[in-house]
Amino acid sequence: MKRLFSVVLALLLAVQLPARVKLPAVLGSNMVLQRNAEVNFWGEASPRSRVRVTASWDGRTHETRADASGRWALKLPTGEAGGPYTVTLSDGEPLVLDNVLVGEVWVCSGQSNMEMPVSGFMFQPVEGAVDAIADAGMYPGIRMFTVPRVSSKTPLDDCDAAWQTATPASVGQFSAVGYFFGRMLYKALGIPVGLITSNWGGSTIEAWMTVEAIDATPGIDHAVAKSGTYDNSIPQRLYNGMILPVCRYTAKGFIWYQGESNRKNWYDYKALQVSLVKLWRETWGDGKMPFYYTQLAPYRYEGDELRSLPLVIEAQYRALAEIPHSGIAATTDLGNPTCIHPARKREVGERLAFLALANDYGVTGLPAPAPVYKSMERDGNKLVLTFDNLPVRAQNGVDSFVAFGPDGYLRPGGFEIAGEDRVFHPAVANFKYWDNRIEVSSDRVSDPVAVRYAFRNYLSLIHISEPTRQAEI
């Protein structure tokens, strides 16, 4: 009897039982797949087994074979936006993903101002949070995936997370900037939007890059760039633990809000920003993925009059000129002198969305991009500044770049000019909206050679922006 039992057991073990396909967390029910694309599917199955993937939007079955270790990958063509659909995978036993939508997918990343949830941080609320949470159920086509905080010495290929549908119960803990960005896309395009957020408060840009990418960045202080000692500042740790687990997921583009933790090496931030964008596009396998980022918002830091913040902001704008398919959302009017996490996250998310809508979806009539300094010429005791994208409508309309100053006239504020001595003095500015120019002058500077705008950590400006953008020089 004992021998008979052993023979039967051996025969049972010899039978190849069907195994269920295993997927990474980012491929799951409730997800949004990028429309009109060949999206990546990958995972594990029985070694050398045939893996079949069938999507209900067209009923077609796509096949591939797992390698000797059980790993497999294939491309799944999507069509126009729509859903909900099912995706069925099998190497013998079916695995069904349901409530799948097809639409637009964006990756949202950065440090705490991107991480800040709709419900806010303790004693640091998000303006309009209650309304945003209450009406979240009106946007069932918004789906959210939050990569957990993981700092890893080695590359990871998965994470512990799941897609969620926008509801009052789920939205409160999701990135506020990310959610408001996605909500505006959803409202403007009328199609599903998938948002993947990967954020860590206090993180440096180097933590989101590979060591090789940092080493290949020319002209920087490599020792400082690699001097991080914390989980969120050591080079490559967050790239390994929070980017690689989702980097194969097909997406449209990126939004980014980071830089506060790089004030110590502001002089290298432009080059590092350019290198990060190049790296991420290579990692996703698409060198033209749009990359939109947020100007750091005003905050006192070491003091109102000090300048660690505007030096980083200047680096952000200089990077813009070297990053194709990019844009920046200005926040000069959205800061807070005593809270590093300002409350007006809706405006930040929407300004980023306006950039995407204008540049990637062909939506016209939006206030994007922000005015950007183009050139300067001298006219006697005045400096005449030329901008791209200055508003061209009436000075006192809702799209005005200016407000009434103390003298009762509409004037831009925050400008300073200097002569050869480089001592800056407050300047009077006149808005020449009809030809995209601003004239600045000061009674204390007869021969001006330099101009700057809002060049301090925090400045209460007398002018207002359009509701959606601010100018930078």
Predicted regions: what they are:
Residues W42, S46-P117, F121-Q124:
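Extended acidic/polar, glycine-enriched regions
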Residues L9-P18:
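Hydrophobic h-region of N-terminal signal peptides that target proteins for export
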